[in-house]
Amino acid sequence: MTQATNQTPGQDVPGAADVPAAAEGQGQGQGERRGGGGGRGGDRRGRGDRRGRGRDERDSEWQERVIQIRRVSKTVKGGKKMSFRAIVVVGNEKGQVGVGVGKAGDVIGAVKKGVADGKKHLVKVPLTRSNSIPTISTGRDGAASVLMRPAAPGTGVIAGGSIRTVLELAGIKNVLAKRLGSKTPLNNARAAMVALRDLRTHQDTAKERGITLEQIYS
């Protein structure tokens, strides 16, 4: 018995040998599209790496010094809850400095919180060419007060305790500072921050008075 086939005259029917070639071509096209997506993903990863390096470079500019770590307690209904308090000074030695306080159940957590708090309370310090302060300044916090005077190149940082730490991380190389009143490290550090915050350059003074720099120096 002869089977009839519905074949249009002049139309070629693809053979079995031609089918794998077409499937292979489709596979190559899909592979190329997948490869293109992988390339774009690689570019995104590259941009992420660059952003990560930028954050690391910014973080590396900051220096941290712990002034004091104390074990403190809080009386609650169930008794006393013990924790640690860390006083940290953060600065980039380029005219920016901050003092922060952190409390946590462990020392590392308290220091991390202190660093974050210090970066939230940064003060910009106007520095002279000799890395000193432009004018005399005083600061007060609680019972502690600090007096700062400009110094000539080569003098160094004449200060002690937490005040010295604040001045060094601010980038000041030549200054005379005197502590008056309380010896508490936190109050002294905050008094030093107030003195640095209230600093005014000669340009600021001339602008406030409405005169020129020549009139100030004369």
UniProtKB/Swiss-Prot annotation:
Keywords: Ribonucleoprotein, Ribosomal protein, RNA-binding, rRNA-binding
Residue ranges, annotated region (Disordered): 1-63
Amino acid composition bias (Basic and acidic residues), ranges on this chain: 31-63
Annotated Low complexity bias: 11-25
Gene Ontology CC terms, in alphabetical order: small ribosomal subunit
Domain of life, source organism: Bacteria
Sequence ranges of Polar residues compositional bias: 1-10
InterPro entries given in the database record: Ribosomal_Su5_D2-typ_SF, Ribosomal_uS5, Ribosomal_uS5_bac-type, Ribosomal_uS5_C, Ribosomal_uS5_N, Ribosomal_uS5_N_CS, Ribsml_uS5_D2-typ_fold_subgr
The keyword ATP-binding appears for this protein: no
Any one GO biological process: translation
Entry-linked PROSITE patterns: RIBOSOMAL_S5, S5_DSRBD
Transmembrane segments: none
Every S5 DRBM domain range: 62-125
Pfam families, alphabetized: Ribosomal_S5, Ribosomal_S5_C
A single MF term (Gene Ontology): rRNA binding
Complexes and interactors: Part of the 30S ribosomal subunit. Contacts proteins S4 and S8.
Task performed by this protein: With S4 and S12 plays an important role in translational accuracy.
Family per record: Belongs to the universal ribosomal protein uS5 family.
Domain characteristics, as noted in the entry: The N-terminal domain interacts with the head of the 30S subunit; the C-terminal domain interacts with the body and contacts protein S4. The interaction surface between S4 and S5 is involved in control of translational fidelity.
Protein name per the record: Small ribosomal subunit protein uS5
